[in-house]
Amino acid sequence: MRTYLDLLQHVLDNGTDRGDRTGTGTRSVFGYQMRFNLEEGFPVLTTKKLHLRSIIHELLWFLKGDTNIAYLKENGVSIWDEWADKNGDLGPVYGYQWRSWPAPDGRHIDQIANLLKMLHGNPNSRRLIVSAWNPALVDEMALPPCHCLFQFYVADGKLSCQLYQRSADIFLGVPFNIASYALLTMMIAQVAGLKPGEFIHTLGDAHIYANHFDQARLQLTRIPKKLPTMWINPDVKDLFAFRFEDFQLEGYEADPTIKAPIAV
């Protein structure tokens, strides 16, 4: 994951110090792209240990179309706690937009199901897109989508994904986003009868919070290790049938976690 460390170093060295919504302050650049070849291993950080349980359960929660944190809490995942209301609701966030985008005529559009149909029927389509950014509902969301649009591309029997992320918390959020969308690409490739290709991560406002600078510098002193591999249960052919037990990260060796505060 030298690619990720290069991003950390680039922003620390070349970023602009700016204010932000949380009042914490950031150092940021605008426009940055990383590429990960999924045939070379699963792109999860080895210079600090990540809580993969949270990443997998959050992705399954998105795919369920769920917007209440009850499922996450039941599975020991707390990453959305700060934004939920007293009933655990988050408003029409990612899962709702992915699986139940509201149309003007009253219909609800299942973007993920439509994507799967297009992959089977017209894999060369340039419309293999899912959007979580719904301007009509942004103000009703507990947190507007940071990773807001992704597109798939099929070539030579391989499925690649490009994600556009409007707001990228490099130290805490981006490592989760890389692993999550890499896994989503692998899952969709499997059910579509394809092999995983690349995950391309395009960042808009790519920032390190001021109270993460020391942690970022510590991480930059560490040497990346060999990437692990992600085993996915080959018997699962339905994207919505995946369960936590269908995934196993093999050969994951990582340095200790580095704690940092969340900017809310």
Swiss-Prot record:
Its main location: cytoplasm. One of its GO terms (cellular component) is cytosol. Pathway: Pyrimidine metabolism; dTTP biosynthesis. Keywords: Cytoplasm, Methyltransferase, Nucleotide biosynthesis, Transferase. One of its GO terms (biological process) is dTTP biosynthetic process. The active site is at C146 (nucleophile). It is found in: Cytoplasm. It catalyses: dUMP + (6R)-5,10-methylene-5,6,7,8-tetrahydrofolate = 7,8-dihydrofolate + dTMP. Pfam families: Thymidylat_synt. (6R)-5,10-methylene-5,6,7,8-tetrahydrofolate binds at H51, D169, A263. GO terms for molecular function: thymidylate synthase activity. The keyword Acyltransferase does not apply. Disulfide bonds: none annotated. Homodimer. Belongs to the thymidylate synthase family. Bacterial-type ThyA subfamily. NCBIfam families: PRK01827.1-3, PRK01827.1-5, thym_sym. This is Thymidylate synthase. It comes from Brucella anthropi (strain ATCC 49188 / DSM 6882 / CCUG 24695 / JCM 21032 / LMG 3331 / NBRC 15819 / NCTC 12168 / Alc 37).
